[in-house]
C-alpha cells in the first residue's frame, strides 16, 4: 500500500484473479460421450425437488448454522483485529503481519483438513475445528498481549481459518451427491456470508458504542460452543444418490 496505494493494490489483485481463468479449462467435462455407453444413473431431480429435500433435512440446516459461525468469526477477526491491536498500542504493521500469517497458514490448514476429511468423520472434524477456535480466542484474550502471542494466534487461526470449507462441502456432497453440490453448497455458503456481515457490522457497531470489542469476543467464543453443539447432529448419510 505504501508503494502503489489502494487502487494499485486492487489492480494487482484483479490481474492475479484473471490469471486463474485459464485454469477453468482443466475442469471442463468431456465434450463427447461414447454412444454405446448405457447410463445407469438415476434420473436427475428438478431444482425445486432438490430444494424441498434439502429443506426437510435437518442436518443440512445444522451444517448451515455452523457455517454462519465460521463467517462471523473470520470476518470479525479479519476486519477488526488490526484495530484491536492498535487500541492496545501496537502499530498497523503488526496487524498486517498477523493477517499475512493467517493467509499463509490457511493454505496448510485447508489442505490438511481436506486430507483428514477423506479419512475421518467430517462432522467430528468440524466439531474439533470450531472448538479449537474458541479455545484459541480464549487463550489470546487471557494471555499477556505481545508480538509473540499475536503471531502465534495468527498461525493458529490460519490453520483453522477456512479449513471448514472442504469439510463442509464434502458433507454436502455426501448428503446430496456431487450433481447438486454447487447449488446446495451455495445455499450453505450464503449463511456463511450472512455471518460475515454480522461479524463485520456488529464488531464496528460495538466498538463505536463502547470503545472496545469485549462483547463481540464473548459472542465469538459462545458461537464456537454453539457450532460444536450443532455439528453433533450433522451426519453424512446419503439423502440423494447420484
Task: State the predicted function of each range.
Residues 1-5, 85-86, 116-117, 202-211:
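Interfacial helix-cap and linker-helix signal at transmembrane-aqueous boundaries
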Residues 20-28, 221-242:
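Multi-pass alpha-helical transporter architecture, strongest
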Residues 28-49, 240-242:
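Flexible cytoplasmic inter-helical loops of multi-pass small-molecule transporters
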Residues 55-113, 199:
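Extracytoplasmic gate region of multi-pass secondary transporters
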Residues 162, 175-210, 220:
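A late C-terminal transmembrane helix in Major Facilitator Superfamily
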Amino acid at each position: 500500500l505504501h508503494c502503489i496505494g489502494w487502487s494499485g493494490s486492487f489492480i494487482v489483485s484483479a490481474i492475479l484473479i484473471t490469471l486463474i481463468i485459464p485454469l477453468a479449462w482443466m475442469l471442463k467435462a468431456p465434450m463427447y460421450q461414447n454412444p454405446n455407453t448405457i447410463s445407469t444413473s438415476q434420473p436427475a431431480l428438478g431444482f425445486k425437488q432438490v430444494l424441498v429435500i434439502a429443506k426437510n433435512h435437518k442436518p443440512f440446516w445444522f451444517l448451515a448454522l455452523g457455517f454462519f459461525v465460521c463467517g462471523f468469526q473470520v470476518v470479525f477477526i479479519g476486519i477488526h483485529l488490526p484495530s484491536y491491536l492498535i487500541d492496545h498500542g501496537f502499530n498497523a504493521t503488526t496487524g498486517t503481519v498477523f493477517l499475512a500469517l493467517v493467509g499463509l497458514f490457511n493454505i496448510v490448514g485447508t489442505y490438511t483438513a481436506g486430507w483428514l476429511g477423506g479419512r475421518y468423520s467430517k462432522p467430528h472434524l468440524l466439531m474439533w475445528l470450531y472448538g479449537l477456535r474458541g479455545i484459541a480466542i480464549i487463550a489470546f484474550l487471557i494471555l499477556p498481549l505481545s508480538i509473540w502471542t499475536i503471531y502465534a494466534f495468527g498461525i493458529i487461526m490460519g490453520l483453522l481459518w477456512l479449513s471448514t470449507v472442504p469439510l463442509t462441502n464434502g458433507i454436502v456432497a455426501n448428503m446430496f451427491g456431487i450433481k447438486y453440490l454447487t447449488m446446495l453448497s451455495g445455499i450453505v455458503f450464503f449463511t456463511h456470508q450472512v455471518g460475515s456481515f454480522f461479524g463485520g457490522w456488529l464488531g464496528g457497531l460495538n466498538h463505536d458504542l463502547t470503545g472496545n470489542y469485549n462483547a463481540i469476543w464473548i459472542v465469538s467464543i459462545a458461537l464456537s460452543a454453539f457450532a460444536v453443539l450443532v455439528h453433533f447432529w450433522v451426519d453424512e448419510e446419503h439423502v440423494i444418490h447420484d
